[in-house]
Amino acid sequence: MAKQIKFEFKDKAYTLEYTRKSVETMEKRGFKLSDISDKPMSVLPDLFAGAFLAHHKFEKREVIDEIFSGLRNRDELFSTLVDMYNEPIVALMSEPDDDEGNVTWTVQ
């Protein structure tokens, strides 16, 4: 199971998570995790906002930014978010556990 971050803000429970679909949505919007070193002022808040897509995709960006501005332990938070963001990508690239029903391919 994928990692999740859970918290409450203004009496509303939030669950942050990345799925294949939310990562794909972020990529289609132009998000590139590889830009984190060159553009941290935009990439880090976008990484945080992207974690809302799986369970709270209609949350207003103003609310997300308000939550972000009140967060503590941001170094640990961003390390966790990067790990969480990479989980669906690793799952996509991993091999199936068993061979039954899997498609094999060859180059000719």
Predicted regions and their residues:
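Charged interaction scaffolds used for protein-protein
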Residues: 1-9, 13, 21-24, 29-38, ...
